[in-house]
């Protein structure tokens, strides 16, 4: 089955989800999605769409379709990708509002948005997989059996979109994320880390920084080895603080 064609994020968010036709999306396919309104890529897979690609999901309800990339092949598929980087075409050194709402395009580099991630993990239990690739074409991954964003908060934003991960499984990458569990998300304009300085500014990114990081997957796209300290796309337990990765994907699937 073919995936829905990608559209710019703002266009999709401003388009009525059950319009008879949207440019780039066949009317019958859109109608089918309007009727069933998938929450995530698990739902899309169950509906018979089992090819990698961009689809619409509805984490906040029927009136707001959100484009997302679904990985339908890795380890059985059904993965909802919330972070994807592979060529440095999109700047990830952004402020709080961008990280809250999401940015980029689902058919390219993008961030799904903290609010969408919170709503997903509020409604279902998820596992997390982090896929990594270096510039020598070596690959590795890390998995976590439990993943959620501020699951018990009255207001997820006031709670800082706190990260919770547990149940690490090594796919060669090592565990660089457990250090960040229990920490609020930080950007250069909203410093919520535990360090005396602003970790997001120091690390040229945005993440669930503590003091500061072992993972910096939203850092600068520096193209491999770099002289600057810990401000690239770093996963310290695999490549250290002086190597910026070529490709990263952070994705969740129902546990």
UniProtKB/Swiss-Prot annotation:
Homodimer. Can also form higher oligomers. Interacts with FBN1, FBN2 and LOX. Interacts with COL1A1 in a Ca (2+)-dependent manner. Interacts with ELN in a Ca (2+)-dependent manner; this interaction promotes ELN self-assembly. Residues 1-21 form the signal peptide. GO terms for cellular component: collagen-containing extracellular matrix; elastic fiber; extracellular region; extracellular space; microfibril. A motif (Cell attachment site) lies at residues 26-28. Glycans are attached at residues 87, 137. Could be involved in calcium-dependent cell adhesion or intercellular interactions. May contribute to the elastic fiber assembly and/or maintenance. Changing residue 241 to A: Significant reduction in its interaction with COL1A1 and ELN. Residues 32-255 form the Fibrinogen C-terminal domain. It is found in: Secreted, Extracellular space, Extracellular matrix. GO terms for biological process: cell adhesion; cellular response to UV-B; elastic fiber assembly; regulation of collagen metabolic process; supramolecular fiber organization; UV protection. PANTHER family: FIBRINOGEN/TENASCIN/ANGIOPOEITIN, MICROFIBRIL-ASSOCIATED GLYCOPROTEIN 4. Keywords: Calcium, Cell adhesion, Extracellular matrix, Glycoprotein, Secreted, Signal. It holds the Pfam family Fibrinogen_C. This is Microfibril-associated glycoprotein 4. PROSITE patterns: FIBRINOGEN_C_2. InterPro entries: Fibrinogen-like_C, Fibrinogen_a/b/g_C_1, Fibrinogen_a/b/g_C_dom, Fibrinogen_C-term_domain. CDD domains: FReD (cd00087).
